[in-house]
Amino acid sequence: MGKVSSVLVNKLVQTDEYKNATNIMLFYPLSDEVNLLPLLKDKTKNFYLPRINGKELECCSYCSGDELCESKFHTQEPTCQACSKQNVDLVIVPALACDKNGYRLGYGGGFYDRFLKDFKRTKICCIPQELVVETVFPEKHDVTMNLIISSK
């Protein structure tokens, strides 16, 4: 996934959505997910990571080197106090697959769909080309992404 991750980071930083954002929420990758953590080297941006609290996703400010702990879902999460998602200009969302209409397939917990339900700013998925499909069979509660960036 290293080469694909590198391609996706390079494509993302060239988008207007990234260039125009100051506060960016990304995710700490699982071993089989795209690794966008090299973005943290961009000192012109403020970064945030998600944390699960009950059934909700929280937004936490993050700087490279800040303390993280492993969650019950085996993701790395910040230990600092949560902040308002209204601080965030751009959310980069993980996905198992995306379709051409901007829908994503997650892990089934609905955390991102609930978090993004009333989020009016930019939502992006960065994903390997082979995980872009015709349809992910979206459900009523699914939130569309503004942009899908593939490795192709």
Where are these regions (language model features)?
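N-terminal active-site beta-alpha-beta segment that forms phosphate/nucleotide-binding
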Residues: 1-84
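Short acidic/polar capping segments at secondary-structure boundaries
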Residues: 54, 80, 96-99, 110-111, ...
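Short secondary-structure boundary segments
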Residues: 28-30, 51, 95-96, 127-130, ...
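Surface-exposed, charge/polar-rich loops and edge strands
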Residues: 86-91, 100-103, 114-152
